[in-house]
């Protein structure tokens, strides 16, 4: 089962079209009990990196910051597929902090992509 946490305001503004998927639930609130049991906090922007309208201000309201990460378990990590909008979707202290594994994630992605490219050569 996968739980996806997002914000009701974003959903109501139809920024996303959520598909109907089996075993997936959408939760519109951040529950401290769930944060405390999370293994990973991952964020990404679902709009163009070039958008300069009101979506930028909307992002800041839901930024992953140190206060949110402090509510997670000691072993929880922060992930992002990069590039990140630092100061809008994630704070500088989180993305560069001890719980962040974004650079390891990027390195693993490069290795996987090289493997796919090598496989496609055959």
Can you name each region flagged by the protein language model?
Residues 4, 11, 66, 106-107:
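Donor-nucleotide binding loops and adjacent catalytic segments primarily
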Residues 14-17, 53, 114:
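Short, well-ordered secondary-structure micro-motifs
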Residues 1-43:
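Glycine-rich phosphate/diphosphate-binding loop of Rossmann-like nucleotide-binding domains
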Residues 30-34, 60-72:
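A short, acidic, amphipathic alpha-helical segment used as a generic capping/interface helix at domain edges
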Residues 2, 78-79:
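Hydrophobic/aromatic residues located in beta-strands of well-ordered beta-sheets
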Residues 45-63:
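Glycine/threonine-rich flexible loop motifs
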Residues 44-45, 82:
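Glycine-rich, N-terminal phosphate-binding loop of Rossmann-like dinucleotide-binding domains
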Residues 75-76, 82-122:
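Adenosine-phosphate binding glycine-rich loop
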């Amino acid at each position: 089962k996968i739980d996806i946490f997002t914000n009701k305001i974003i959903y109501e503004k139809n920024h996303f079209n959520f598909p109907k998927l089996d075993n997936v639930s959408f939760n519109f609130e951040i529950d401290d009990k769930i944060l405390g049991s999370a293994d990973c906090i991952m964020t990404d922007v679902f709009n163009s990196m070039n958008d300069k309208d009101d979506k930028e201000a909307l992002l800041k309201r839901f930024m992953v910051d140190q206060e949110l990460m402090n509510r997670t378990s000691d072993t929880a990590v922060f992930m992002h597929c990069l590039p990140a909008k630092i100061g809008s979707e994630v704070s500088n202290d989180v993305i560069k902090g001890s719980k962040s594994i974004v650079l390891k994630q990027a390195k693993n992605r490069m290795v996987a992509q090289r493997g796919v490219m090598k496989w496609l050569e055959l």
